[in-house]
Amino acid sequence: MKLRISLLSLTFAMAVFSTVTAHASGCSNSTIRGSYAFTIHGTIFLPDGSTLLVDGIAKETFDGEGNVTQVDAVATNGNLTPGWRPGTGTYSLNADCTGTQTISVLGMPDLHLQIIVAQSGNTIHQVVIDPGLATTAEGERVKASKD
């Protein structure tokens, strides 16, 4: 009987600890506070059936409250406009570290992304979900914000 009670107590303790650990490792908007360097690759599918290859880099800074600013340099078919193109946006992270993001760049339609945060907030994977775009980006933290 004592063995059965001990095993039941141990099982209960492990279940409680597992729940606390799972909760502690969850994500929120504050998980990705700071700056990240991204590499961007993909394809734009034009209405006439032709395609444009996309390659670039971006620096995105997340404020931990759902807002993001960014600059990027993106080439299409090997043509890059000199300088950094600024943008702003919003993001929302779920407890399971999946989320959504919207980026607005002057003179362009908004981009809508699905995101996954990994490695305790040190890595972000993005995919653009707008029709006609097959573009992904991988980002790694370059500077954490303590504010």
Regions found by a protein language model. Name each.
Residues 1-10:
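Bacterial N-terminal signal peptides that target proteins for export
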